[in-house]
Amino acid sequence: MLRKIPFLFYILLVTASANAQYYFKDIISNKQLIADMTAYKENKVRTITLKSFEDNGSESEGFFCEKKLSRDYRKAELFTRADIAPASLFTSIFDKDGMLLITKDSSDLSVTDIVYTYDDKRRIASVISHIKSNDDDFVNIISQEHIYTYNENNQPEKMILVKNKKDSTIILFGYDDNRNVSIEKDTKNGTKFFYYYDSKKNLTDIVQANEYSKRLKPDYVFEYNSAGKITQMTAVEEGSNNYFIWKYTYDNGLRIKEKCLTNEKRLMGSIEYEYK
């Protein structure tokens, strides 16, 4: 009998996006990691255990996931293991002011290192990544540099993307009337991402368009509670019209449960968080 793939790993595989979304991945995600560590520190959290459950309520077989935080809250280590995937360790390093400096995602198959630098206004100046993957026959190394410049309103104006230290592309940003980043354009291939916000400037939608199609394709849709926490995220399956809906529950500012549903509202599984 074939072993069932834990739902969490299945979802991560089918929603893993190859799309750019540099503003989202470099700047917004950076702020979220910093905010998460701040919340852990305020609640004196030292260990977080994640439990994964299948659609029938049974615990995902062979799944283990735990995050440990250092005493000074400058280091977080997330260890994940499952029967169907190699064990992985995701490490985040912060400076004394809580700014994210380094992330490292490592397993037997690949290692991804990302280094963040900031200017004197605490804005991201660069994001430098190195990905090393191992196969039976060869080792593949990919590097990227994202170098940001800003306008007089402290908004990202341009990003120079350098791949493997030789191939460069300029990414341009545009803004809406509320000075939110609303457009991200790759000047080489014409790909555009549109960012939409609610009245509180929370990001609500990321929509993709390109020069060869007039049809706008949503990648993510977010909903929030009164405290500004994400209560629902809709993520489109890569290369498909299917999508998954994540619903989040919080207590004292910390996420305690999330469940995943298909576009047909069928429960795929859930995750529960334990804090110590």
Question: Model-flagged regions — what are they?
Answer:
Residues 1-25:
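Bacterial Sec-dependent N-terminal signal peptides
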